[in-house]
Amino acid sequence: MHRPYERVSLDFTLELAERLFTDSSRPAVWVNLFFPSELIWGLGLVPFYPEMGAGIGAGLGMSPTGLEQSEALGYSVDLCTFNRSAAGLRAAGFYPRADAYVSTSNLCDVTGQLLANVVHEEGCSFVLLDVPQSPDESSLAYFQIDLTISCHPAASGISF
């Protein structure tokens, strides 16, 4: 028996895959699962979550391919299996295009490191938002500065 939310999740996942793989009219952004999706959708971008891709790949029996590819690339077996599989599935050509890469330092920072590695290989830009752990006024001020520097280099006067 399927619950209504399962159908909504499936429909959303299929629509997202269609946008990522067949519609290049909107920029695709690779993000970690903890990045605020409201920022991505609000800017008219289409998000891709490498960890989610690895989970879907596992459901399709593709994890061995992803893990073998990541091992061949030198990724340590000590890393998170989702991220190792994601690195391998990307290398094998199973992941969609990316127009930009962004991540947060919130909770899991391995995906941010994976994306930074991809950016290094591709020679493009990367934004890492350093999310404070405590929700107080000084943390909010810090995060506002981080957003300005990371997302608006012209406004901050800092070029990357």
Where are these regions (language model features)?
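An N-terminal assembly and electron-transfer interface module characteristic of large anaerobic redox
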Residues: M1-F160
